[in-house]
């Protein structure tokens, strides 16, 4: 679809619409002689060495200039909004915030929640991995950048501003505030689509650099049954009009600072506090500035994902500056590595400060990718500097603007240090892994490691393709690393899977029903109630009101009975479909629409769920205070006997930490703090309590239920809770588990369940005391004494076993039979698999075959290097005769037979092979 993008300013101020002679796209300009749109590769950078803004700005100065301009605008004052975390806790469809508009998707865009201000202005740190392979090379690409933006949400009947005003505001900011030359600014028409939305858009270009994008979001993805007269096609996808029309702008903070300084790259302009120290550490010689400038000018027109080959760029730059490609590579490569390290470590600082824990999954995977890529770059530079030292430079520089960096500094640096140690261990183990894979490829006659194998090495074992290449080339095997390797694996990691639950009842059969009145919220202590039957569908009964809690948020459903005409019918499951609650019953035939039934909750089950749910919130507060603010809930589940809480944490929780957590949680219980809950508009709740609200994951709806423990914990939660912490009863941590990389599981019990666990422990202590005939307080020293005595006895047993083995070897040697040039030993003996394996190892000689079978059916075989068969072939023959299974290497094999009565037949059969 082609949009007509004529604005008031273009018409009134003499702007001309032209078609770019290079790319053919339409653009608007004040310059009648202009023939190109201003966008690379149609135009080169024209500001390097000649800044396009009269005065130099720092990041802080440019950010404040932008925010203040929109905040204080006379006609359109905007509400200033603080940055959102780069880890978007309010949504589950993306891993990281990649643009300012993502702060307001889906709730504000859909109209389910009000924006924090309308219109608003924000400077949002954004992280994108799509360009990771361009970072350091093009001079303009970053994984971390700040998207300065002004947004307006035009709800039906409540317009704010649209295309005319947006273009005028942008032009006013650039020309009046930053003093850019109007005739050098172009507005290029380029429809935008992303995140399920689309609309017409302008790219604002100035002297070869895109400095802003102005999107007019007015379409959403079309459903399959959308009316055809409403459907428009944008970039090959079908869309329909949105009710809310959104002004979605993005101004590149780093690019504007770069424009004001005219440095060879944007990295020099905004990351100098890391770039310069790294240059000194690496001892990099200063190169001719002309090389850097020409490299940047051409690199600005280059995209690895498009051209795919860095060599092409090198050739063009080398030709322009009059040196060889090799000379250029030698001069420019260290700079590119340093720029990439500076960018990646800044992205890491934001990610870790906002709660990302490095791991093998989701955002943690992307953090680990940055860490390992940065370490690899440092290694290529020959630098031994710890990565944590570089991250510390970012914290030192940025903490005044982002005070949370200083608060999290110790944890951020410890996470990085631990990751560096893990990577060193990965490399140590990984070398053998790569060599084994190379051996397999060589056997098949393959002389190059395929790309999919490089991806497996990276994703499953943490081995970067550069490391694999280094090892492979020593073994004579080729490795071609795709130029876009890292953006390729990051793209795969960023895909989020949509989980669809089982459909219990067809929603179409429920959509005409009113929302179920939730009595469990009105009175969480309601044990009995009366309600009217609205519908019966298969085994499910729908009531107009219920005190039965439906499964959700980690809390199991309630059970109990519905009493019909004096008869109790069991309720075995309760679920929520939309805003309707459905009850599974044992005898659905007993229910008729319109009848009144009496419900009774299994109170013993419910109250224990309430104890465990409130206890989960108490424990979460203790975990954050003891372990740090990086701790976030990664899942939870309640039962009547125990509860579990999964948290993000970068190492195992120590015993001392567990004691402190448990003590702190129980102190809050004993203080009997108030637990309150209220329904708040989503935006109000976020502004009041921050994004730590979303501990339990994304909570849908315009209004969210906020559960608050007095001065301790606040979460958006739909569960049933106790009115004070004292009712939780004692909290006992039973154990912790490492369920996956970066996630700790705490299993605990509250109230009666905790008391039962203490009673179990007391019974075990009593039993152990009775066995050892000592009082419980003497158990540790008695157990230690017994253990030491057992160790001494074990040493004696081992000595005797070694002596017996020596005698057995001597005896077996004496039974050796000569068959031609081969020595053969075959016997049935006593011993474990381990014993047999040790014996055949000791008896092994170049021209000898040894077959030993134990009376328990274990067997071991050894074959000398000068014997013409392999041990694993003999193992197959043994199991063919006596059943069972086994296998091994060329020289040693082992296994177990099913039929021990055939042991002698086996030995004779093997012996006959050499007769």
Curated annotation (Swiss-Prot):
Binds 1 zinc ion per subunit. It is found in: Cytoplasm. PROSITE patterns: AA_TRNA_LIGASE_II_ALA. Its EC number is 6.1.1.7. It catalyses: tRNA(Ala) + L-alanine + ATP = L-alanyl-tRNA(Ala) + AMP + diphosphate. It holds the Pfam family DHHA1. Homodimer. PANTHER family: ALANINE--TRNA LIGASE, CYTOPLASMIC, ALANYL-TRNA SYNTHETASE. Catalyzes the attachment of alanine to tRNA(Ala) in a two-step reaction: alanine is first activated by ATP to form Ala-AMP and then transferred to the acceptor end of tRNA(Ala). Edits incorrectly charged Ser-tRNA(Ala). Incorrectly charged amino acids occur because the of inherent physicochemical limitations on discrimination between closely related amino acids (Gly and Ser) in the charging step. NCBIfam families: A-tRNA_syn_arch, alaS. This is Alanine--tRNA ligase.
């Amino acid at each position: 679809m082609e949009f007509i993008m004529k604005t008031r300013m273009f018409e009134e101020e003499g702007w001309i619409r032209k078609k770019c002679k290079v790319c053919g796209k339409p653009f608007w300009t004040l310059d009648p002689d202009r023939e190109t749109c201003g966008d690379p590769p149609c135009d080169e950078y024209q500001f390097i060495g000649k800044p396009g803004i009269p005065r130099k700005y720092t990041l802080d100065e440019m950010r404040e200039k932008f925010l203040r301009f929109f905040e204080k605008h006379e006609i359109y004052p905007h509400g200033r909004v603080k940055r959102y975390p780069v880890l978007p806790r309010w949504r589950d469809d993306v891993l990281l915030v990649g643009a300012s508009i993502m702060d307001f998707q889906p709730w504000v865009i859909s109209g389910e929640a009000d924006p924090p201000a309308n219109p608003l202005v924000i400077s949002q740190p954004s992280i994108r991995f799509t360009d990771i392979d361009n970072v350091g090379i093009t001079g303009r690409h970053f994984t971390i950048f700040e998207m300065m933006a002004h947004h307006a949400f035009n709800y039906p009947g409540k317009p704010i501003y649209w295309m005319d005003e947006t273009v005028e505001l942008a032009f006013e900011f650039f020309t009046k505030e930053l003093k850019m030359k109007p005739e050098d600014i172009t507005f290029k028409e380029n429809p935008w689509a992303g995140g399920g939305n689309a609309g017409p858009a302008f790219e604002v270009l100035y002297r070869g650099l895109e400095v802003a994008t102005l999107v007019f979001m007015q379409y959403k993805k079309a459903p399959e049954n959308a009316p055809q007269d409403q459907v428009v096609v944008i970039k090959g996808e079908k869309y329909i009009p949105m009710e809310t029309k959104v002004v979605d702008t993005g101004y590149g903070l780093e690019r504007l600072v770069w424009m004001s300084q005219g440095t060879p790259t944007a990295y020099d302009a905004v990351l100098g506090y890391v770039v310069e120290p790294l240059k000194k550490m690496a001892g990099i010689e200063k190169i001719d500035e002309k090389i850097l400038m020409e490299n940047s000018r051409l690199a600005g027109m280059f995209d690895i994902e498009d051209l795919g080959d860095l060599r092409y760029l090198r050739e063009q730059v080398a030709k322009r500056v009059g040196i060889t490609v090799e000379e250029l590579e030698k001069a420019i490569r260290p700079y590119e590595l340093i720029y990439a390290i500076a960018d990646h470590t800044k992205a890491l600082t934001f990610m870790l400060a906002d709660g990302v824990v490095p791991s093998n999954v989701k955002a943690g995977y992307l953090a680990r990718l940055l860490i390992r890529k940065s370490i690899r770059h440092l290694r290529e530079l020959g630098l031994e500097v710890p990565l944590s030292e570089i991250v510390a430079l970012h914290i030192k520089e940025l903490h005044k603007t982002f005070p949370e960096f200083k608060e999290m500094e110790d944890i951020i640096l410890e996470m990085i240090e631990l990751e560096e140690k893990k990577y060193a261990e990965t490399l140590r183990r990984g070398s053998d892994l790569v060599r084994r894979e190379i051996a397999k490829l060589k056997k098949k006659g393959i002389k190059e490691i395929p790309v999919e194998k490089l991806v497996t090495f990276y994703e499953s074992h943490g081995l970067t393709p550069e490391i694999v290449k280094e090892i492979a080339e020593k073994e004579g095997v080729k490795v071609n690393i795709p130029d876009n390797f890292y953006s390729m694996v990051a793209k795969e990691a960023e895909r989020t899977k949509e989980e669809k639950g089982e459909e219990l009842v067809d929603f179409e059969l429920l959509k005409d029903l009113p929302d179920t009145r939730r009595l469990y919220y009105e009175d969480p202590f309601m044990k009995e109630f009366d309600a009217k039957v609205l519908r019966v569908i298969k085994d499910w009964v729908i009531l107009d009101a219920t005190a039965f809690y439906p499964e959700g948020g980690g809390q199991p459903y309630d059970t109990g009975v519905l009493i019909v005409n004096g008869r109790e019918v069991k309720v075995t499951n309760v679920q929520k479909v939309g805003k309707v609650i459905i009850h599974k019953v044992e005898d659905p035939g007993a229910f008729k629409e319109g009848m009144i039934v009496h419900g009774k909750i299994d109170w013993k089950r419910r109250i224990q769920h309430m104890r465990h749910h409130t206890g989960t919130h108490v424990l979460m507060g203790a975990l954050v205070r003891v372990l740090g603010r990086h701790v976030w809930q990664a899942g939870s589940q309640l039962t009547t006997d125990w509860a579990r809480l999964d948290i993000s944490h970068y190492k195992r929780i120590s015993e001392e930490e567990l004691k402190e957590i448990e003590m702190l949680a129980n102190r809050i219980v004993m203080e009997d703090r108030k637990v309150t809950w209220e329904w708040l508009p989503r935006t109000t709740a976020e502004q009041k309590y921050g994004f730590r609200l979303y501990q339990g994951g994304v909570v849908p709806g315009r209004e969210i239920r906020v559960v608050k423990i007095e001065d301790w914990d606040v979460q958006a939660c739909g569960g049933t809770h106790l009115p004070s912490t004292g009712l939780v009863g004692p909290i006992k941590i039973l154990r912790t588990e490492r369920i996956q990389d970066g996630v700790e599981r705490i299993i605990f019990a509250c109230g009666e369940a905790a008391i039962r666990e203490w009673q179990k422990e007391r019974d075990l202590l009593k039993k152990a005391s009775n066995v050892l005939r000592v009082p419980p307080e003497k158990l540790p020293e008695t157990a230690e004494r017994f253990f030491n005595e057992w160790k001494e006895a074990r040493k004696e047993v081992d000595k005797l076993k070694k002596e017996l083995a020596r005698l057995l070897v001597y005896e077996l040697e004496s039974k050796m039979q000569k068959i031609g040039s081969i020595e053969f030993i075959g016997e049935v003996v006593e011993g474990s698999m381990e014993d047999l394996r040790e014996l055949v190892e000791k008896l092994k000689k170049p021209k000898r075959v040894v077959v030993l079978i134990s009376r328990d059916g274990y067997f071991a075989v050894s074959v000398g290097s000068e014997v013409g068969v392999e041990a694993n072939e003999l193992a197959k023959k043994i199991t063919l005769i006596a059943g069972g299974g086994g296998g091994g290497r060329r020289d040693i094999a082992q296994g177990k037979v099913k039929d021990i009565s055939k042991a002698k037949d086996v030995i004779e059969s093997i012996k006959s092979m050499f007769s």
